Amino acid sequence: MYLENYKRFEAIIDKLREFEGAIIVEGARDEASLRKLGVRAEIIKLSRLPLPEVALIASEYDEVMILTDLDRKGEELARKLAWYLEGYGCKVDTETRRELKMIAKKDIKGIEDLYSLYLRVSLRFWPPEEGI
């Protein structure tokens, strides 16, 4: 990961930490990775519930971020979830996942890898330059 992408990655991590809605992930390891990064938002896991039920639960929040894995299956899940959630009138954030995919797809396969990537790139770019 290059310095420019590192700065964008840091901005995404900050956004995740500050997010106050619900975040939908695929499983427990995804949630664990986000918690290690300091994410305090409500996290809803897809692993045990049908998509319509997950969307109904998430629709209770003003804003919902979809963070499914960065592969084709994750893309399809994100698309379907967004459709259900928009049907409930939710504000849906799929942009964060798209941004993450653009800058980190070569480095990670899924959300469960975010924390380890964060550690690797933080060490690589330490100490930070002024203004990072």
UniProtKB/Swiss-Prot annotation:
Binding site for Mg(2+) 1: 26, 69
InterPro entries given in the database record: TOPRIM_dom, TOPRIM_RNase_M5-like, UPF0292
The protein's required cofactors: Mg(2+)
Matching Pfam families: Toprim
Cofactor note: Binds two Mg(2+) per subunit.
Keyword Metal-binding included in the entry's annotation: yes
Domain Toprim: 20-100
Binding site for Mg(2+) 2: 69, 71
GO molecular function: metal ion binding
UniProt keyword terms in alphabetical order: Magnesium, Metal-binding
Annotated coiled-coil segments of the chain: none
Family: Belongs to the UPF0292 family.
Protein name (record): UPF0292 protein PH1700
Native source species: Pyrococcus horikoshii (strain ATCC 700860 / DSM 12428 / JCM 9974 / NBRC 100139 / OT-3)
Lineage, top ranks: Archaea, Methanobacteriati, Methanobacteriota, Thermococci, Thermococcales
